[in-house]
């Protein structure tokens, strides 16, 4: 994997991976921590750089970011973020999708400053995340 391949893939489609990393690291995560976790995950084939940073193993990705915790992930279709304690949620709009991290029914992390999918779209599916000691 070339470094430019990595950056191109990360720029195009790492939103779900970044949500998992943010969930594992918490609200004080630094850009350097995001980069380090994403790079390590790519090196270990936990994310697939050839498929726009597709997450192959969410739990392994969060373990790379923060190995001191225990994680579980449950996939479900949703139509709203209300009631979601912690989860990555996919919004869809006009044929495009974007993932954000939701805590207590509110978006707490969005890797894009301005996402049309989130602004105009609807919640379609979620990855409910549980974190333990």
Task: List each model region and its residues.
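Active-site nucleophile-adjacent alpha helix/oxyanion-hole segment immediately C-terminal to the catalytic cysteine
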Residues: 1-48
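Phenylalanine-focused residue identity feature
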Residues: 6-7, 34-35, 54, 109, ...
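Conserved active-site-adjacent core of cysteine acyl-enzyme catalytic domains
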Residues: 26, 39-94, 103-112, 117-124
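Histidine-centered active-site/metal-ligand motif
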Residues: 98
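Short, structured beta-strand segments at or near domain termini in extracellular proteins/domains
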Residues: 121-133
């Amino acid at each position: 994997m070339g470094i430019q391949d990595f950056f191109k893939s990360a720029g195009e489609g790492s939103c779900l991976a970044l949500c998992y990393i943010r969930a594992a690291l918490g609200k004080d995560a630094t850009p350097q921590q995001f980069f380090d976790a994403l790079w390590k995950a790519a090196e270990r084939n936990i994310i697939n750089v050839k498929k726009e940073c597709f997450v192959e193993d969410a739990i392994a990705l969060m373990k790379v970011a923060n190995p001191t915790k225990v994680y579980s992930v449950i996939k479900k279709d949703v139509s709203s973020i209300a009631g979601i304690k912690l989860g990555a949620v996919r919004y869809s709009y006009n044929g495009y999708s974007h993932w954000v991290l939701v805590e207590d029914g509110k978006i707490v992390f969005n890797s894009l400053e301005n996402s049309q999918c989130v602004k105009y779209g609807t919640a379609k599916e979620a990855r409910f995340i549980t974190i333990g000691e």
